[in-house]
């Protein structure tokens, strides 16, 4: 992998609610260590807690949401996605380029 300048990303991660608190922490640590192992830097982690999913994913109606702002080389993103696909505790993930790190996140609740 060539040395390219790191870019800022926002990663959204939804973990299974069947995980214990310790298992969820280990699953989150796995995501974080994946980023740092590729030379990335974590800027901010937002723990959004347990929330209702917009639709059922693998039988789950709820998930634990985390948003992580990090910088890493663009070439590392593909490798991270490969790792995410192998992580059975991770229901969904999305990675977007970010312009800045948001200090506060606010979301509207889903209708009942």
Curated annotation (Swiss-Prot):
Family: Belongs to the bacterial ribosomal protein bS6 family.
UniProt GO molecular function: small ribosomal subunit rRNA binding; structural constituent of ribosome
GO terms under biological process: translation
Keywords, in A-Z order: Ribonucleoprotein, Ribosomal protein, RNA-binding, rRNA-binding
Gene from which this protein is expressed: rpsF
CDD domains: bS6 (cd00473)
InterPro entries: Ribosomal_bS6, Ribosomal_bS6_sf, Ribosomal_S6_plastid/chlpt, Transl_elong_EF1B/ribsomal_bS6
Species of the source: Chlamydia pneumoniae
Domain of life: Bacteria
HAMAP family, per the entry: Ribosomal_bS6
Protein name: Small ribosomal subunit protein bS6
Cellular component terms (Gene Ontology): cytoplasm; ribonucleoprotein complex; ribosome
Function: Binds together with bS18 to 16S ribosomal RNA.
